[in-house]
C-alpha cells in the first residue's frame, strides 16, 4: 500500500518535471531565433485582436460590476466609522493591487486561454503543424510565437481597462448613489495611490500572469493528444492549471512586493 502510494507519487513528480521541460523547450524554440518582423507582425496584430479585443466585453462588464460591488460593500463598512470619504482609496487600492490583475488573468484564462488551447490542439489534430514542418516552416515561430506575444501584450492592457472601469463603477455607487463627496472621493484616492508602489506593482503582476496563462494555454494545446477527447481534456487543464498558477503566483508576488511593508 505505502509502496504503491510512493510509486504513484514519484510518477506524478517525474511527469510534472517532464512536462515542465517540454514546455520550456517549446517556449525557447518559439522565442529564440532570428526575428522576422515583416512576416510575424501581421500575425501578431491579428492575434492581439482575437485575444485582446474580443475579450473586451467580458473584461469591461466584470470590472464595472466588481467596482460597483466594492463601492457598495466598502461604503457599508466605512459609514459605521464615519470614514466614507476613504471609499475611493479602498476601491482603488483593492483593484490596483489585487482584483484588477488577478480577476483579469482568471477571465483571460477562461476565455482566451481555453480558445488558444483548442485552436492549437485542433491544428495538431488536423496535421496543420506537421504540414508546416514539411514546407520547412517552423511551427513554433509561425504559430506559437505570435500568439504568445499577443497574449503577453493584451492581458496587461485588459487589466488596466478593468481597473479603470472598476474605479468608475465604484464612484457610480459611492458618489452618485450613496452621496459621498466627489472631491473627497477622488482627492483621497489620488493622495493614497503611489505610482511605484501600487500602479507599477499591479502592472508587473499583470505581466507575470499574462506570461503564465499564455504559456500554459499554448503548451497544453501543443502537447495534447491529437483527438477530440485529448483537445477537450487539454482545454480543461488549461483553465484549471492557469487559475491555480495565477492564484499561487499572486501570493508569491504579493509577499515580495507588499509583504515587507
UniProtKB/Swiss-Prot annotation:
Bilayer disposition of the protein: Multi-pass membrane protein
Compartments in which it is found: Cell inner membrane
UniProt keyword list: Cell inner membrane, Cell membrane, Membrane, Transmembrane, Transmembrane helix, Transport
Keyword Cell inner membrane: yes
Main location: membrane
Cytoplasmic side: 1-12, 71-147, 220-238
Entry superkingdom: Bacteria
UniProt function note: Part of the ABC transporter complex MlaFEDB, which is involved in a phospholipid transport pathway that maintains lipid asymmetry in the outer membrane by retrograde trafficking of phospholipids from the outer membrane to the inner membrane. Probably responsible for the translocation of the substrate across the membrane.
NCBIfam families tied to this protein: MlaE family lipid ABC transporter permease subunit, perm_MlaE_1
Homology family: Belongs to the MlaE permease family.
Name of this protein: Intermembrane phospholipid transport system permease protein MlaE
Native source organism of the sequence: Haemophilus influenzae (strain ATCC 51907 / DSM 11121 / KW20 / Rd)
Amino acid at each position: 500500500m505505502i509502496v504503491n502510494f510512493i510509486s504513484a507519487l514519484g510518477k506524478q513528480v517525474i511527469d510534472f518535471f517532464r512536462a515542465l521541460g517540454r514546455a520550456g523547450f517549446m517556449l525557447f524554440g518559439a522565442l529564440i531565433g532570428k526575428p522576422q518582423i515583416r512576416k510575424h507582425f501581421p500575425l501578431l496584430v491579428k492575434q492581439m485582436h482575437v485575444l485582446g479585443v474580443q475579450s473586451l466585453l467580458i473584461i469591461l462588464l466584470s470590472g464595472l460590476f466588481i467596482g460597483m460591488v466594492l463601492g457598495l460593500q466598502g461604503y457599508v463598512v466605512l459609514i459605521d466609522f464615519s470614514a466614507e470619504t476613504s471609499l475611493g482609496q479602498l476601491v482603488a487600492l483593492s483593484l490596483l493591487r489585487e482584483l484588477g490583475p488577478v480577476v483579469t488573468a482568471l477571465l483571460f484564462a477562461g476565455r482566451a486561454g481555453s480558445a488558444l488551447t483548442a485552436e492549437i490542439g485542433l491544428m495538431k489534430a488536423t496535421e496543420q503543424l506537421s504540414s508546416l514542418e514539411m514546407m520547412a516552416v517552423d511551427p513554433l515561430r509561425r504559430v506559437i510565437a505570435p500568439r504568445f506575444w499577443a497574449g503577453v501584450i493584451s492581458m496587461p492592457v485588459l487589466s488596466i481597462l478593468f481597473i479603470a472601469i472598476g474605479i468608475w463603477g465604484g464612484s457610480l455607487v459611492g458618489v452618485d448613489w450613496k452621496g459621498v463627496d466627489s472631491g473627497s472621493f477622488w482627492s483621497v484616492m489620488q493622495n493614497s495611490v503611489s505610482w511605484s508602489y501600487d500602479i507599477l506593482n499591479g502592472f508587473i503582476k499583470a505581466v507575470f500572469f499574462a506570461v503564465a496563462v499564455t504559456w500554459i494555454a499554448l503548451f497544453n494545446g501543443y502537447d495534447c493528444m491529437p483527438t477530440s477527447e485529448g483537445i477537450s481534456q487539454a482545454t480543461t487543464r488549461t483553465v484549471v492549471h492557469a487559475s491555480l498558477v495565477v492564484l499561487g503566483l499572486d501570493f508569491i508576488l504579493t509577499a515580495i512586493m507588499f509583504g515587507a511593508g
